[in-house]
Amino acid sequence: MTRKRFLCPSVCRSRAARTGESKRRRLHSHDRRRCAITPDFDEDGRMAHIANPRPNPLECAEASQKVIMAPSRSDTTGAHRCLEDAAPVGELLVPRSSADLHESQRGQPSGATDSQASTLETESAPPSADSSSSAKLQRDDEFLAKYRVIGTLPAGSFGKILVCALRASVGEAEASRVPRSERRVAKRVRATSRLAIYLENEILALQYMNHENILKVEEVLRSEAYTYMITRKYDYDLYSFMYDGDLQWKDRPLLWQTRAIMKQLLCAVEYMHDKLLMHRDIKLENVFLNGDGTIVLGDLGTAMTFEKPRVARDYGWVGTVTTNSPEMLAGDGYCEITDLWSCGLIMLDMLSKDLLPLNGNTKKPGKQLRRIIRSLSVCDEEFPDPPCKLFDYIDSAEYTHTPMSVPPLIRRMGLPADFEYPLVKMLTFDWHRRPGASELLALPLFSSTITEERLFVWGLKSGAAHFSSWKPACRIESDTAALSLTMSDDDE
């Protein structure tokens, strides 16, 4: 029989104190490890990478009073500001303090209308000291006076998503009767929130660019409480088109649809890189599309400037773990070529018969990186040359796979050569060997003379449910030769 050991109360209290202190130390250590790979914020709302602190040039007085974009690579006429006057390379495009930015813009004319504002049924009133000032704040909100909220969408990474329409266009019609062409999406964040930094960054990046495959900002409205970015509403994003809520296949794009989507996506990425901007968070959820086959790239809250192409720098970890490139997951320096890895994952998800083949469903970069190495059978000779942190994961390398060959995961998909080659190139493990967007667009799959008008029938009924309703204007001879297209009889 085991004898129980009794301790006096003072000993129990001392032991409990030591146990609590040990737990606090472990939690503190865990927080330090977490902050080493994720962005954190200080009391002023500035984002700081704990693992690699460095001075922020945007804290100078001149930079905090003006918002400047980086020049285009092709600009040699001096039409744009030089890099010395632009936002410092490797920093967000806006001043870090959203409160300072809002204060500098408060004196600008807002152009508010005098029409009666209504309350927001789906949202609570902004917090305030007393209810009368809160009600006045809502009545004075220009967005609520100009737009009518008819619904909400799942919240994004950096704000609340509202579905709205102009009051002057739809009046008080039922939400279900509002035409799709009149619907807009408003991304809303609190003006004093740390998330306002990312929204202001996205607004600047989108307003700086003008491309048919990049989301366009229709209007920006600011009140004392919120900042709104209004854009066109698209039918769905690529993720909601492909998968349902239970992560089951809903529609898998056909080969010719995949080609059209990827060509437009690469055109958008090429344009961004020509403007010396990298996205850093390209994924299925950030590619928006309509039933007519047009796609746009959005959600540029993490976009960042760079000075020279293919020059890796330590910009810090950002984005989504499951779609980050190997160099970013390892904590190495990276460049704009990291966006091409994300494009390759999108193409892999569209062509694969498996659900998200490289999605490890993890938030740990190291675990996701080892999953990539195993899934793509990365050989030790395919690792970048040291010194680099990525070389520390060479113990997970595949030693039986032929270096620089097609990974078995992709080979088993049985794709046509025109599809397999660009997919393998985009998913090249070593970013030094990974091609840029311009090189990929020069490949036969995307450089074909087939026009987009020949791939789609325009003028589809508004609100087409899925891409399966698209009708190619030319027929494909076989699935293994997706690019050998012939004219339909009614087109001759």
Swiss-Prot record:
GO process annotations (BP): symbiont-mediated perturbation of host apoptosis; symbiont-mediated perturbation of host chromatin organization
Pfam families per the record? Pkinase (PF00069)
EC class of the enzyme, as a word: transferase
Q: Name one GO cellular component term.
A: host cell cytoplasm
Annotated spans, Disordered: 99-137
The residues that hold ATP are 153-161, 187
Q: What is its EC number?
A: 2.7.11.1
Q: Which SUPFAM superfamilies match?
A: Protein kinase-like (PK-like)
Keywords, alphabetical: ATP-binding, Host cytoplasm, Host nucleus, Host-virus interaction, Kinase, Modulation of host cell apoptosis by virus, Modulation of host chromatin by virus, Nucleotide-binding, Serine/threonine-protein kinase, Transferase
PANTHER family given in the database record:
OVARIAN-SPECIFIC SERINE/THREONINE-PROTEIN KINASE LOK-RELATED (PTHR44167), SERINE_THREONINE-PROTEIN KINASE CHK2 (PTHR44167:SF24)
Protein's name in the database: Protein kinase US3 homolog
Task: Name its species.
Answer: Psittacid herpesvirus 1 (isolate Amazon parrot/-/97-0001/1997)
Which lineage ranks, top first, belong to the organism behind this chain? Viruses, Duplodnaviria, Heunggongvirae, Peploviricota, Herviviricetes
Encoding gene per record: US3
